[in-house]
Amino acid sequence: MTLEEIRNEIDAIDPKIRALLMKRFDCAYQVAEAKNRSGDLRVYRPDREDEILSRLSEEVAEEKRSGYLSVVRKIMQASRMYQYGLLYDWNEGLFEPLIRDIVIPGNASRVRVRLSRPNRPNAMSEILSMIGDYGYNMELMELISDNREEGTVTFELTILGNLNETNMKKLMFQLSMECMIFRIEAVG
């Protein structure tokens, strides 16, 4: 095959992938509806995701496995983002407990948060990816503690963006749900 023929084949595959992803998002919508009805707004289930990744990778050739798992992880991250966005839209008042007594200036351009996650592969790269997926950049990331005994890491992040924006509020909500400890430290 020529390079052009190979690219044409890839171009023919991409719409099929899109159709399957849209079907998967339809399922994610139904999951969010079920969670909303039950009152359990937790979407992130690392144990279930690990099980899925293990099962799906069994029949993938070793030389393709890490790339394949990277794509599957990204699909799961996008699904969680979609579900958390829906849950946020459907439930008033989810954001207010996160800001406590913090005053958000109208011209706020950054948010400093502290969060703890299990110290495992992709734990922090998922956070960084999530920030970018919501359309924001990180200005600073500082390791506060690496608790090897408990297997956790705590970071302080400064995210560039306005906490008055709905997408930033959705990001904060998702971070609060996916981190063991989450706190908005300052807004400026």
Where do the language-model regions lie?
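Short, charge-rich amphipathic alpha-helices with coiled-coil/heptad character
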Residues: 1-3
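A charged helix-plus-loop insertion that forms the helical arch/lid used to bind
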Residues: 40-46
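Low-complexity, intrinsically disordered terminal regions of eukaryotic RNA-associated proteins
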Residues: 17, 22, 34-38
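A general alpha-helix detector
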Residues: 5, 30-33, 51-56
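Amphipathic alpha-helical coiled-coil segments
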Residues: 6, 10-13, 17-20, 27
